[in-house]
């Protein structure tokens, strides 16, 4: 186990649909003490293996001067039952602010396992190992996993306090608050730790968000415990007081504008006859949010409208030649048809009229045979929609002998066209229609600057762009459009609001079944739909039943 493991950005990997999400909570015991005058200031780095290399995923906060830290930072991960997801936890004595770099930090030990092992055990404790597999003394790390797939809510809380006890001789207390959930076995699980407010007996702590699952295991009557401490830089925090409540009590008290609790120190209460409290803790704000799922929106009546855009540039080869990517063989569908049918048959189940807009680009089209980068392949500019995916297939096959393959490979016009439809939908202020643009192309786009600009604008709209690269061209430059490796920016430097592009080289999936192909190509769409409507704060139109006829009869 090495503390200086090489970390690289994982290349774009097409994920499979995830079975569930899990939260990981960490704590350590008996850490090595690397500081000569004080105790270690530990933090934990989480890494995940991707294609044989370790990718740094996240890092906990630093717990000052502690050899037995309990971290409040929660790692949320997608759990794939069918994959071996290798994880590495590395513990460091942190010098300076907790960032992504561990270069100047002292390695205290690490542990490798799989996410499946953690999930299966729910609570896993392992020894920490130094380099070459040596034990790091008696150091251990404990990882607790919780499934949050069924939870669709979170709460925003804001606490403040008044007239806290002064624990410092020459200044006022430096208070912070810890919120714990009481488990069924009586143990206490740290939910959140606030920041420290320096030199203040009437602190106002920053608001924070926490899932209902984390807060109370989605049981509103589960006991919660709040403790207030006076911060000590050496880790010997002074206890000010605590109180016990429930989330149900919090909500009721907040609604009645009586959300405050005596902060009580039990030792003082026993010793002092007139003791009342060590201050008062006030719940200044409580906001309960529901996080809607992809199926919430679909079952609420949101339609998925699919537009197909096909590359008719000359680099595909003469369709009359059997080597052409556009060659029609009645016994062996070409790559365009395979990708088109696999994706289209899934998408049409989410659109009540099952009509697809079918467009082409990069060809000379009749009657004047001028180059067009946005034409209806049914040659009806007034209505470019086809009946079902089979209608698109027929229009494609009928179109081939009527056009002259030409170029260049410009896709920005079609992205902008679909974006205009999505913009009209956005103005309705409802979660009623989401647009998917499926672009099938045999090469790198030639209008990259315009395409980046169009995608950045489209990232603000209810739409996603899926690009399938057919053939054996070098598609390396296309990865820039997929935001997995960083934030896509327009030529002017404007960042995309969200990642809406999924690029898939067909050759990596050509031996996959149509169902597997569709799952890979559409893997990111549910997340993108939820991200858009969540950002706009738009709930599903109807949670009680569907307003349209479409339904998830074949969920991707």
From Swiss-Prot:
Changing residue 104 to N: Does not inhibit calcium-dependent translocation to the cell membrane. Its main location: cytoplasm. Residues 305-504 form the VWFA domain. Residues 1-128, 135-262 form the C2 domain. Changing residue 174 to N: Inhibits strongly calcium-dependent translocation to the cell membrane. Inhibits strongly calcium-dependent translocation to the cell membrane. Leads to the constitutive (calcium-independent) attachment to the cell membrane. The keyword Metal-binding applies. Residues 536-556 are annotated as: Disordered. Its cofactor is Ca(2+). Keywords: Calcium, Cell membrane, Cytoplasm, Membrane, Metal-binding, Nucleus, Repeat. The keyword Metal-binding applies. It is found in: Cytoplasm; Nucleus; Cell membrane. Ca(2+) 2 binds at residues 168, 230, 232, 238. GO terms for cellular component: cytoplasm; nucleus; plasma membrane; synapse. Ca(2+) 1 binds at residues 168, 174, 230, 232. One of its GO terms (biological process) is cellular response to calcium ion. The C2 domain 1 is not necessary for calcium-mediated translocation and association to the plasma membrane. The C2 domain 2 is necessary for calcium-mediated translocation and association to the plasma membrane. Calcium-dependent phospholipid-binding protein that may play a role in calcium-mediated intracellular processes. Belongs to the copine family. This is Copine-7. It comes from Rattus norvegicus.
């Amino acid at each position: 186990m090495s503390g200086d493991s090489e970390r690289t950005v994982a290349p774009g990997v097409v994920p499979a649909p995830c079975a569930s999400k899990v939260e990981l909570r960490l704590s350590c015991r008996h850490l090595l003490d690397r500081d000569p005058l004080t105790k270690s200031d530990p933090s934990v780095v989480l890494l995940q293996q991707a294609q044989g290399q370790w990718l740094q995923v996240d890092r906990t906060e630093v717990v000052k001067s502690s050899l037995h830290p309990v971290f409040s930072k929660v790692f949320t991960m997608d759990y794939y039952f069918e994959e071996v997801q290798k994880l590495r936890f590395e513990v460091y004595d942190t010098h300076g602010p907790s960032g992504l770099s561990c270069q100047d930090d002292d390695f205290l030990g690490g542990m490798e396992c799989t996410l499946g092992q953690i999930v299966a055990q729910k609570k896993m404790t392992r020894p920490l190992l130094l380099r070459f597999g040596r034990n790091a003394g008696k150091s251990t790390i404990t990882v607790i996993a919780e499934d949050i797939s069924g939870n669709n809510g979170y709460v925003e809380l804001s606490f403040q306090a008044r007239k806290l006890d002064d624990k410092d001789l020459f200044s006022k207390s430096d208070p912070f608050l810890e919120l714990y959930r009481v488990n069924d076995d009586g143990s206490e699980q740290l939910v959140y730790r606030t920041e420290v407010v320096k030199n203040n007996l009437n602190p106002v702590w920053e608001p924070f968000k926490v899932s209902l699952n984390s807060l109370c295991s989605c049981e509103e009557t589960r006991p919660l415990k709040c403790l207030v401490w006076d911060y000590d830089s050496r880790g010997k925090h002074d206890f000010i007081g605590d109180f016990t409540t429930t989330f149900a009590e919090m909500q009721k008290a907040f609604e009645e504008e009586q959300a405050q609790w005596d902060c009580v120190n039990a030792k003082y209460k026993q010793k002092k006859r007139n003791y009342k409290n060590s201050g008062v803790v006030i719940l200044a704000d409580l906001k309960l949010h529901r996080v809607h799922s992809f199926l919430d929106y679909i079952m609420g009546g949101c339609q998925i409208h699919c537009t197909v855009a096909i590359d008719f540039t000359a680099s595909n080869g003469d369709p009359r030649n059997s080597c052409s990517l556009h060659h029609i063989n009645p016994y062996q569908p070409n790559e365009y048809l395979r990708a088109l049918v696999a994706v289209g048959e899934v998408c049409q189940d989410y659109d009540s009229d099952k009509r697809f807009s079918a467009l082409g680009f990069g060809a000379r089209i009749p009657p004047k045979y001028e180059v067009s980068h946005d034409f209806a392949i049914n040659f009806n500019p007034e209505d470019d929609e086809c009946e079902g995916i089979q209608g698109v297939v027929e229009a494609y096959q009928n179109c081939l002998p009527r056009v002259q393959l030409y170029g260049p490979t410009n896709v920005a016009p079609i992205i902008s066209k679909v974006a205009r439809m999505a913009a009209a939908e956005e103005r309705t202020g409802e979660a009623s229609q989401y647009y998917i643009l499926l672009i099938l192309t045999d090469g790198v786009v030639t209008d990259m600057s315009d395409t980046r600009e169009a995608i950045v604008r489209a990232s603000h709209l209810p739409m996603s762009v899926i690009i399938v690269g057919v053939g054996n061209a070098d598609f390396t430059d296309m990865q820039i459009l997929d935001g997995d490796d960083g934030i896509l920016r327009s030529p002017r430097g404007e960042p995309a609001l969200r990642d809406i592009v999924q690029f898939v080289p067909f050759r990596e999936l050509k031996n996959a079944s149509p169902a597997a192909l569709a799952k890979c190509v559409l893997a990111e769409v549910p997340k993108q739909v939820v991200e858009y409507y969540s950002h706009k704060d738009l709930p599903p139109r109807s949670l009680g039943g569907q307003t349209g006829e479409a339904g998830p009869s074949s969920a991707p």
